[in-house]
Regions:
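A charged N-terminal "starter" segment
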Residues: 1-105, 141-147, 178, 303, ...
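Conserved, mostly hydrophobic/aromatic
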Residues: 11, 51, 79, 109, ...
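Active-site beta-loop-alpha junctions enriched in small/polar residues
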Residues: 28-34, 50-54, 69-71, 90-94, ...
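Acidic/polar active-site rim loop that often engages polyanionic ligands
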Residues: 76-82, 114-121
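Solvent-exposed alpha-helices and their adjacent loops that cap or buttress functional pockets
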Residues: 81, 101-102, 118, 185, ...
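Active-site loop/helix belt of alpha/beta enzymes
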Residues: 115-246
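Charged (often Lys/Glu-rich) extended helix/loop segments that serve as interaction or gating elements
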Residues: 222-334
Length: 334
């Protein structure tokens, strides 16, 4: 029977690595809830969330950064009364709802940066334009209910190339605007390793993040980082059982629809433990869907029905669907 196995020590190792880069780490809870529960109990991590249900699941409102999206006064009041004080908004309507609360809080404006590898039509681009942010900051800075004012920026998942944040922010904000900002949240996007993604760029990315943090500290601005995939992916493996092998096809007792939706969403291919030698096989899930494919070609030595086939770095976005009557895959903590 298929199962996800979370290695707690890897979760904590990844957290501790990223913690050295920023003043605050806020884990993107949507990436993998089970990893979030470990971080809640074992670290001082904050959590970036997008729903009241996630707020209730975590039950630590003092460590929540809440992202508003199309909310109303009822939702905003409910979240605030639960104890949340840190908020991110990405449009003026959601901002006005928050201001109408007339309660003390910490606010971050989500700002869009110029994109070079993400195209509208497939991806929605979140955030205020930089000119709008600059117009809003003076009045928000003077608002007595806003205790800390910040900017949130985030490009995309698996961001391997666009990390020149220091130069971008320098070009956007004059010094008088930066003096009114308490916090910069750089979002997530730190890549993980897959068959079709190599993470050799991590050292350069970390150097860019450190450069930004040091520059912000010179201006007395705190930096928040929002890892999700970077912590969750390498902490989890997916163990499946081979049901049958024929004509260089392997059918496993799982499906991308309940075990690897990330395959669709971000076009990644999971690594397989022990691959590299033998014959090429296509690894297919157990549904009748022709695109239920974990890997189009993986070199394996003499796989047999009943063998365990283990996918590595499998912890990001493990949500499931009920397609063809599939059940969620059980999760175990190692």
């Amino acid at each position: 029977m298929s199962r996800f196995i979370i290695k707690k020590s890897t979760v904590l190792d990844q957290f501790n690595k990223i913690k050295t880069l920023a003043d605050t780490v806020s884990y993107s809870f949507k990436t993998n809830n089970h990893v979030g529960y470990i971080l809640r109990e074992e670290t001082d991590c904050f959590f970036s969330i997008h729903s009241i249900k996630s707020l209730d699941l975590l039950n630590c409102p003092e460590r929540i950064i809440y992202f508003a999206q199309g909310w109303d006064m009822k939702e905003a009041s409910h979240v605030y009364n639960k104890g949340v004080r840190d908020f991110v908004v990405d449009n003026e309507k959601d901002l006005q709802v928050l201001l109408d609360l007339q309660q003390p809080l910490n606010l971050m404006l989500r700002m869009r940066l110029k994109e070079h590898t993400v195209h509208t039509g497939k991806h929605f681009v979140f955030g205020f334009y930089s000119g709008t942010v600059q117009k809003l900051i003076p009045s928000l800075h003077s608002n007595q209910n806003i205790e800390k004012l910040g900017i949130h920026v985030h490009r995309k998942t698996q961001n391997i190339s666009e990390w020149s944040l220091k130069s971008e922010l320098e070009n956007i904000f004059p010094e008088e605007t930066l003096q009114k900002i308490d916090t910069i949240n750089i979002g997530g996007g730190i890549p993980s390793t897959y068959k079709n993604f190599r993470a050799e760029v991590l050292e350069k990315i970390f150097a860019k993040i450190t450069e930004l943090r040091d520059w912000l500290h010179q201006k007395d601005i705190r930096m928040i980082i929002e890892p999700g995939r970077y912590i969750a992916a390498p902490s989890v493996r997916l163990e499946t059982k081979i049901l049958t092998v024929y004509e260089n096809n392997i059918i496993v007792d799982s499906s991308i629809y309940n075990g690897a939706m990330d395959t669709f969403v971000t076009n990644i291919r999971l690594l397989i433990e022990g691959e590299g030698e033998g014959e090429p096989y296509t690894i297919k899930g157990k549904t009748p869907d022709s695109i239920d494919i974990f890997r189009y070609k993986a070199y394996l030595k003499d796989p047999k029905p009943g063998d365990t086939l283990t996918f590595l770095n499998a912890g990001a976005y493990t949500y499931s669907t009920d397609f063809c009557g599939l059940d969620p895959i059980p999760v175990e903590i190692d």
